[in-house]
C-alpha cells in the first residue's frame, strides 16, 4: 500500500497554507500577504489575532482551562447574560437561557433535541428549506436542504421535511399535519448563495408558527453578531424567535457555539437531557467574553452597515457582476456566467481570499473591522480576477 501524502483525511482541498494573521491580513508559508474576505467562513469578525481576545486567552490560559460541566465556572453565566441581552436588541434582556457548545452544528443539534423534547410525543418533525445549510452531523445534514450533500450518507434520519425558501404557502402546507415540532430557518441563506428572503417572509413564519403552536428556530450561525448590520439578522424584521443558534463569530476563532431559547422553551430541558464535555469551558468563554466586549465597544453593527454599503456599491459597479445580494458584510456577487470557482482561484493568486458558494456566486465576508482602504483594495483585486476569468 502506498503511504498517503498526509495523515489528514482527504475531506478538504486546501488552496494555501497560512502561518500568521493580523487584522484583515493573512501570510502564507512563503511570507506572501493576502487580504482576507472569507474570515474563516465568517468566524474572525474582529480580524485575526485581535489583541483583546489574544490577551484574554493568554490570561485565562494561566488560570484555568477546563473543568467539565460537572462543575460551574464564573465566565459562562456572564457570557450567557450578554448573549441574552444582544438577542433582546442590545439594551434589555430577552429573558431566555443559553446552552453552550463548540460549533454551529452542535448548536443546531441542541435546538433539534430541544424542539422535540418541548413538543412531546407525536410531534417530532422539523421543517427546513431547500438551499439551507445547518451542519454536517447526520441530523443537521438531514435538515440541510441540499440533496447533493445527502446522497453519500443515505439512509438519513427521518422526521425532516423541506420546502422552498421564501414560500409561505409551502410552509403553511407543511405545518398542516399536526406532527411538526419546529421550523428551522436561516434569515439569510449563506451557503445557498447569500439569498435574502422577501421582507414579509420571516414575519410570516413567526405568525404561522405562533398560530400552529410550532417553534420558530433561527439559525444565526453565519448571520449573527453584527455580520448583517444588526446583532442578529432576525431583528431587521421586528420579531422574536423561540430559539436562536449562534457560533462562528462568537469566539473570533475559538470554537464556541450557543443555543439560546426563551425561558418557556428552555424549561423543557432537565438535567441529563443534553450535555457536552467542552462547551462553556473557561478558556472558550474567555474568548467569547472578550469578543462580545470588543463588538459592543467598537459598534460593529454600525461598522458593518457602513462598510457593507461601500463594498456592495463597489461590487455592483464591477464589469461582469450581474447583481449583489445580502446585507451588511455578508454579500454575494452573482457573476454574468458560472465561473465563481475560477474567479476565487484567480483572486487567490492575486492575494485576495473570497469563496464560491454557487456556480455563479462569490461570497464576501470580511472582518467587521475592515477599513475603507481594505475594501477598496479588495474590490480592485476582485475586479481584476473577474476581468481575467470572464475575458477568457
Predicted features by range, described:
Residues 1-392:
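Conserved N-terminal phosphate-binding loop of PLP-dependent enzymes in the Aspartate aminotransferase
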Amino acid at each position: 500500500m502506498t503511504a498517503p501524502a498526509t495523515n489528514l483525511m482527504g475531506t478538504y482541498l486546501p488552496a494555501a497554507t497560512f502561518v500568521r494573521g493580523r487584522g484583515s491580513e493573512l501570510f502564507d508559508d512563503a511570507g506572501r500577504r493576502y487580504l482576507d474576505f472569507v474570515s474563516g467562513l465568517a468566524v474572525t469578525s474582529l480580524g485575526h489575532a485581535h489583541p483583546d481576545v489574544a490577551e484574554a486567552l493568554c490570561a485565562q490560559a494561566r488560570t484555568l482551562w477546563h473543568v467539565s460541566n460537572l462543575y460551574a465556572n464564573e465566565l459562562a453565566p456572564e457570557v450567557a447574560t450578554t448573549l441574552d441581552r444582544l438577542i433582546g436588541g442590545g439594551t434589555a434582556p430577552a429573558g431566555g437561557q443559553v446552552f453552550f457548545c463548540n460549533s454551529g452544528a452542535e448548536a443546531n443539534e441542541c435546538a433539534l433535541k430541544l424542539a422535540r423534547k418541548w413538543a412531546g410525543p407525536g410531534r417530532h418533525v422539523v421543517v427546513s428549506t431547500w438551499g439551507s445549510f445547518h451542519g454536517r452531523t447526520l441530523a443537521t445534514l438531514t435538515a440541510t436542504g441540499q440533496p447533493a450533500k445527502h446522497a453519500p450518507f443515505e439512509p438519513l434520519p427521518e422526521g425532516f421535511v423541506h420546502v422552498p425558501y421564501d414560500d409561505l404557502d409551502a410552509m403553511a402546507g407543511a405545518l398542516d399535519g399536526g406532527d411538526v415540532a419546529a421550523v428551522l430557518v436561516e434569515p439569510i441563506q449563506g451557503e445557498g448563495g447569500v439569498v435574502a428572503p422577501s421582507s414579509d417572509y420571516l414575519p410570516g413564519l413567526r405568525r404561522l408558527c405562533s398560530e400552529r403552536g410550532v417553534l420558530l428556530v433561527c439559525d444565526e450561525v453565519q448571520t449573527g453578531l453584527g455580520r448583517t448590520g444588526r446583532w442578529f439578522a432576525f431583528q431587521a424584521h421586528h420579531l422574536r424567535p423561540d430559539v436562536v443558534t449562534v457560533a462562528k463569530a462568537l469566539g473570533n476563532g475559538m470554537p464556541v457555539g450557543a443555543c439560546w431559547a426563551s425561558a418557556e422553551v428552555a424549561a423543557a430541558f432537565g438535567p441529563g437531557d443534553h450535555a457536552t464535555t467542552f462547551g462553556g469551558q473557561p478558556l472558550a468563554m474567555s474568548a467569547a467574553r472578550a469578543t462580545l466586549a470588543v463588538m459592543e465597544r467598537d459598534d460593529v453593527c454600525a461598522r458593518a452597515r457602513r462598510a457593507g454599503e461601500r463594498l456592495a456599491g463597489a461590487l455592483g459597479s464591477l464589469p461582469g457582476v450581474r447583481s449583489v445580494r445580502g446585507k451588511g458584510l455578508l454579500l454575494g456577487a452573482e457573476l454574468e456566467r458560472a465561473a465563481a470557482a475560477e474567479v476565487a482561484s484567480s483572486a487567490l493568486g492575486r492575494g485576495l481570499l473570497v469563496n464560491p458558494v454557487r456556480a455563479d456566486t462569490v461570497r464576501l465576508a470580511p472582518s467587521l473591522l475592515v477599513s475603507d482602504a481594505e475594501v477598496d483594495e479588495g474590490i480592485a483585486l476582485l475586479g481584476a480576477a473577474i476581468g481575467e476569468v470572464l475575458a477568457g
